[in-house]
């Protein structure tokens, strides 16, 4: 007769899962699949209706993408700052690599898209759609491999995706925003200056930063710029080290480490899964073979799958070979190729730009299919390459 499973064993197993590096990626993949199934089931109408219910000034979907995801960007920003000051990005040769790779990873996808749509001037308005990398999904996939992927590569991907998102924000502001609120933008700059001043004054309490951070989010949102940028900007002002000689002076007890520790589990198991479920639900109704072979669909898919891979990898190869940058520590070229492919997971920001670029629902369907196809293939290719070269190394 089999023995009953003890509650202690269940708690221990659950704790091991939550503490494993791959767990966040597994949860994200599961909820993304659940969203796709839901969006193509009898529950689809309720799913899409719920996302567009207005709660105050914003729909539920916008609260998730603009407010909740600011916490994700805050956490990623904290990690980037820590690595830049005291980690894998602490030298200029390592900082320049993700920056240049992000630029290459935006230029080549745009060129691929233009190549497919050069005969249709109206479609060229969507040139920026495949330039974006979805940082949450890309990091979710790479986290599936846990410690088998060097930490330096994960930091490289996070830094590249952050710069990529900042580039997407600039593109939206310059090419897809007609009513930028300069007054709100100026006020946001003033709040950011105050946060920087607090850092320079060595104010170590977290609550003043978080309070002004909330104000910064409101002002960035009001300016017309994607509000998640506020999370990154706030992170850059959080102190990494305490005042020398104080009890809090160790790295582990610095404000940045403390906030990073607070955010890690909620972001991995609440924020990102909610984001994934809200954004991954793409309906296949009305999709035909003709939809998949339209130049617009193919341009978006090729831009994400091929443009990102070629743009990121060729830029990294060039910089390393001419001696301007170093390959991330303990990483192989095979692993770098896999990470370059993961950069083609576009999803949220690509969808956002696509909806801004085109108002026609039929055209939007083509855009969504291109994003889904390109992102899915990029994720599969990147994961396959990482799995292959992780075994070899």
Swiss-Prot record:
The chain crosses the membrane at residues 24-44, 58-78, 96-116, 126-146, 155-175, 178-198, 214-234, 267-287, 300-320, 338-358, 369-389. One of its GO terms (molecular function) is sodium:proton antiporter activity. It comes from the Bacteria. Its main location: membrane. GO terms for cellular component: plasma membrane. Coiled coil: none annotated. GO terms for biological process: regulation of pH. It catalyses: Na(+)(in) + 2 H(+)(out) = Na(+)(out) + 2 H(+)(in). It is found in: Cell inner membrane. Na(+)/H(+) antiporter that extrudes sodium in exchange for external protons. PANTHER family: NA(+)_H(+) ANTIPORTER NHAA (PTHR30341:SF0), SODIUM ION/PROTON ANTIPORTER NHAA-RELATED (PTHR30341). This is Na(+)/H(+) antiporter NhaA. It comes from Rhizobium etli (strain ATCC 51251 / DSM 11541 / JCM 21823 / NBRC 15573 / CFN 42).
């Amino acid at each position: 007769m089999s023995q009953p499973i003890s509650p202690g064993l269940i708690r221990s197993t659950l704790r091991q899962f939550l503490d494993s590096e791959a767990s966040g990626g597994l949860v994200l993949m599961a909820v993304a699949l659940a969203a796709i199934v839901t969006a193509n089931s009898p529950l689809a109408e309720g799913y899409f209706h719920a996302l567009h219910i207005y709660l105050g000034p914003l729909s539920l979907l916008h609260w998730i993408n603009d407010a909740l995801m600011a916490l994700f960007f805050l956490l990623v920003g904290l990690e980037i700052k820590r690595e830049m000051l005291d980690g894998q990005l602490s030298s200029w040769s390592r900082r320049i690599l993700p920056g240049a790779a992000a630029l290459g990873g935006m230029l080549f996808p745009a060129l691929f898209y233009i190549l497919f749509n050069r005969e249709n001037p109206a479609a060229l308005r969507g040139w920026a759609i495949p330039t974006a990398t979805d940082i949450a999904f890309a990091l979710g996939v790479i986290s599936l491999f846990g410690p088998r992927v060097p930490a330096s590569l994960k930091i490289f991907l996070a830094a590249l995706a952050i710069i990529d998102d900042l580039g997407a924000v600039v593109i939206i502001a310059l090419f897809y925003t007609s009513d930028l609120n300069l007054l709100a933008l100026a006020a946001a700059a003033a709040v950011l200056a105050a946060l920087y001043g607090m850092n320079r004054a060595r104010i170590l309490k977290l609550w003043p930063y978080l309070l002004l951070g909330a104000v910064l989010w409101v002002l960035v949102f009001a300016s017309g710029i994607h509000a998640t940028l506020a999370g990154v900007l706030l992170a850059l002002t959080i102190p990494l080290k305490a005042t020398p000689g104080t009890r809090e002076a160790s790295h582990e007890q610095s404000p940045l480490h403390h906030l990073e520790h607070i955010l890690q589990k909620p972001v991995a198991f609440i924020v990102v899964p909610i984001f994934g479920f809200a954004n991954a639900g793409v309906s296949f109704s009305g999709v035909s073979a003709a939809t998949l072979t339209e130049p617009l669909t193919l341009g978006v898919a090729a831009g994400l799958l091929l443009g990102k891979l070629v743009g990121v990898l060729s830029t990294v190869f060039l910089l390393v070979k001419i001696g301007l940058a170093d390959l991330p520590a303990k990483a192989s070229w095979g692993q770098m190729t896999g990470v370059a492919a993961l950069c083609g997971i576009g999803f949220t920001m690509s969808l956002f730009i696509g909806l801004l670029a085109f108002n026609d629902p039929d055209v939007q369907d083509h855009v969504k299919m291109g994003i889904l196809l390109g992102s899915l293939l990029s994720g599969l290719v990147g994961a396959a390459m990482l799995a292959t070269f992780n075994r070899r190394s």
